């Protein structure tokens, strides 16, 4: 999902014999994506520490309003660690977040040789429909699925549809 998808396809390109199929979830190969830049700007502006787990959950709810309380709690627990006194801190390296560069990966995208599934939430601003279609056209063994009812976090917002899509792809790769 997201930047992890970029990492996955780079691994698939550099180690083609080790990857039998690939899923890319709501991310594109573009170097400059205004929505991605906006998301990172919001992450930069966030505090490193939060008063409580509930405060983290509320922050996540603001980003992902369609996610269930259970999903948000799970995410908050695994994305933060508890400090003495009950405060929470993100499990992230701020220096990496600030140094993150988004290279153009279209050339690498075209080198993917394994069956690939592109999954996009129709309400996502991060992976636009026109870019997803171009991604589908650039490589041979690929399928594009666009799911209704969610944005960038649709695997949480519409987890049943996402799971069905994953199972379908794994059973019938292109």
What are these regions (language model features)?
Residues 1-2:
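Conserved alpha/beta-hydrolase "nucleophile elbow" surrounding the catalytic nucleophile
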Residues 9-53:
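Flexible "cap/lid" loop of the alpha/beta hydrolase fold
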Residues 18-20, 139-142, 150:
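Core-facing hydrophobic residues within beta-strands of well-ordered domains
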Residues 33, 49-108:
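Conserved alpha/beta-hydrolase catalytic His-Asp/Glu region
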Residues 48, 124, 151-154:
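Glycosyltransferase donor-binding loop in the core domain
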Residues 165-173:
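C-terminal alpha-helix
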